[in-house]
A protein has these predicted regions:
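Outer membrane beta-barrel
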Residues: 15-167, 172-179, 183-190
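Cleavable N-terminal export/targeting peptides
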Residues: 1-10
């Protein structure tokens, strides 16, 4: 009986250790204060976002990611899977940030301001909902992307085929958006 109990404990420990190695959980919340000096000011503390993230390593080449915003009723932000075919060639399928502009792909945690995107990025990438035709997409869409880094990370590319409808929205037509970017990093610190 003691030997069987030890084997069960060892087996359970192996499962727990494997899960710890393969699954990482993270999250953050951002709070702010809005000051308005208008005739009728609307000064207020507010919550900007409450984010939960999970990253799973299925195999050495295959991963999956999940991101959810609990603020204001909750909203699925990202859910996708990556598969690395070769060094420098990875395919992604799911809902993720559109590879359009440098700012759109930055996390709000890496930018100094809570409302962190320029007006042009908010409009063109659909981050803020300022484009009434495109709506509020949070800079995300559903689709497929090929991406990678080449020449010792000197060159980074991303090419995506997206629905073009935005966040959590099924395609409403048979047309797709083709989006991409090409980044050159001539110096390590740039």
């Amino acid at each position: 009986d003691t030997l069987v109990a030890q084997e069960k404990t060892t087996s359970l420990n192996q499962v727990v250790n494997t899960l710890k190695e393969r699954i990482s959980l993270a999250g953050y919340a951002q709070l702010g204060y809005t000051y308005d000096d208008a005739v009728k000011p609307d000064n207020t503390f507010d919550i900007k976002r409450i984010i939960f993230m999970a990253h799973g390593k299925i195999t050495k080449r295959w991963t999956c990611d999940f991101m959810y915003d609990f603020y204001n009723g909750g909203m699925l932000l990202e859910v996708y899977t990556d598969y690395q075919f070769l060094p420098g060639l990875t395919a992604r399928i799911g809902e993720f940030k559109v590879p359009y502009t440098i700012e759109n792909e930055l996390s709000p945690t890496t930018v100094e301001l809570i409302n962190c995107y320029s007006q042009s990025v908010c409009y063109l990438a659909g981050v803020s909902g300022s484009d009434k035709c495109y709506g509020m997409t949070s800079g995300r869409d559903i689709g497929m992307m090929l991406h990678g880094k080449l020449f010792h990370d000197f060159l980074q590319y991303k090419v995506a085929v997206m629905n073009g409808q935005g966040l959590n929205t099924k395609d409403k037509n048979s047309q797709k958006d083709v989006v991409g970017n090409l980044m050159v990093y001539p110096l390590e610190w740039l």
